[in-house]
Amino acid sequence: MESLTLQPIVHIEGTINLPGSKSVSNRALLLAALAKGKTRLTNLLDSDDIRHMLNALTALGVQYQLSNNNTVCDIEGLAGSFHPQQPLELFLGNAGTAMRPLAAALSLGEHDIVLTGEPRMKERPIGHLVDALRQGGAKIDYLEQTDYPPLRVCGGFSGGSVDVDGTVSSQFLTALLMMAPLAQQDTTITIKGELVSKPYIDITLALINTFGGEIENQNYQRFMIKGGQQYQSPGKYLVEGDASSASYFLAAAAIKGGIVRVTGIGKNSLQGDIHFASVLEKMGATIRWGDDYIECERGKLKGIDMDMNTIPDAAMTIATTALFAEGETTIRNIYNWRVKETDRLSAMATELRKVGAMVDEGRDYLTVIPPKQLTTAEIKTYNDHRIAMCFSLVALSNTPITILDPGCTAKTFPDYFEKLASISHAKV
């Protein structure tokens, strides 16, 4: 297996232009494909998850042109739902942001499509979404294990009243919201339980609005959607920078800055993960907000105890930042870490212990007590891009750290380690 050893970094300073947001990129691609007219998407993320969506759209008859660096995409919209002429099998890797929305979008019309992916994708639950789609008339079969991909989707969704469990993943609701305006009849979606990762629903609603869709949001408990709508291309759409990816550079500044500025996101961004910066501020870092940047400067960091349900991806970065804080840090209400690219709660606890931390792993929380001195270790990354990036921060101590399978960052941030090196000053 490939590995990358990061030598101790003594100082961090500089500016990072962020790659496009994964969450925004895949939503925008799907909506542009379903819309009437041609859409130019700029600052599109160039990564594995986006390629899986693009490959699926090609198979489904969508025509598009990508720029040489894969960050500008001109898409000819279909002016409605997908109508593939023959049975298809779509391989979606481990891209939840492709699997869930496509399962919903393909529930419209009549066809025979199999959605499958990597072994880990077959362990990521999708039953709550399938249950909701079936309530609206969709014909969907599980091909292996009940409640998990691969799926056979044969269309049939027409609308009506559906309820969806909100406690596991906001992507199920996102998938329903993007598809429902194109259904023949009106749809009412009722949320069961507490809706997790609510800021991701705000991203979805903002994008639907940009493409001319109308949804009535009744306090995130019920959503009323008129059927028979048509998405309209906005012409051009700029994908903002990935706020989850910003977290590593902002945390690095909080630990060993110097001032680091990340550009492509700012105080008015769609993404909830910008509030990671506010968590760093609570820990003791200095944060400055601009319209299209966030700056962080080192401070004396103290441990915190916080509910981080609204920033689940960026909250992982707090777990490794906690290694450099005074006192213990507890990250609460993060059960949905367990259904991501890997069981992130278990994986983070295991790897944090390797570098010397004392860790209490609960069902839905993680407590980290930093050691006096971090120990060098080989970090297993579980084919999870965020674990690889989180543990790169250990190099901000006086201890080298080895990251196994560093290429797994290709899921969202292929050149992450090069970007980190560009603002790092190592021991000579």
UniProtKB/Swiss-Prot annotation:
Phosphoenolpyruvate binds at K22, G96, R124, Q171, R344, R386, K411. One of its GO terms (biological process) is chorismate biosynthetic process. Its EC number is 2.5.1.19. GO terms for cellular component: cytoplasm. Pathway: Metabolic intermediate biosynthesis; chorismate biosynthesis; chorismate from D-erythrose 4-phosphate and phosphoenolpyruvate: step 6/7. Keywords: Amino-acid biosynthesis, Aromatic amino acid biosynthesis, Cytoplasm, Transferase. InterPro entries: Enolpyruvate_Tfrase_dom, Enolpyruvate_Tfrase_sf, EPSP_synthase, EPSP_synthase_CS, RNA3'P_cycl/enolpyr_Trfase_a/b. 3-phosphoshikimate binds at K22, S23, R27, S169, S170, Q171, S197, D313, N336, K340. CDD domains: EPSP_synthase (cd01556). It comes from the Bacteria. SUPFAM superfamilies: EPT/RTPC-like. GO terms for molecular function: 3-phosphoshikimate 1-carboxyvinyltransferase activity. It catalyses: 3-phosphoshikimate + phosphoenolpyruvate = 5-O-(1-carboxyvinyl)-3-phosphoshikimate + phosphate. Gene3D superfamilies: Enolpyruvate transferase domain (3.65.10.10). Its main location: cytoplasm. Pfam families: EPSP_synthase. It is found in: Cytoplasm. The active site is at D313. PANTHER family: AROM/DEHYDROQUINATE SYNTHASE (PTHR21090), PENTAFUNCTIONAL AROM POLYPEPTIDE (PTHR21090:SF5). Monomer. Belongs to the EPSP synthase family. Catalyzes the transfer of the enolpyruvyl moiety of phosphoenolpyruvate (PEP) to the 5-hydroxyl of shikimate-3-phosphate (S3P) to produce enolpyruvyl shikimate-3-phosphate and inorganic phosphate. This is 3-phosphoshikimate 1-carboxyvinyltransferase.
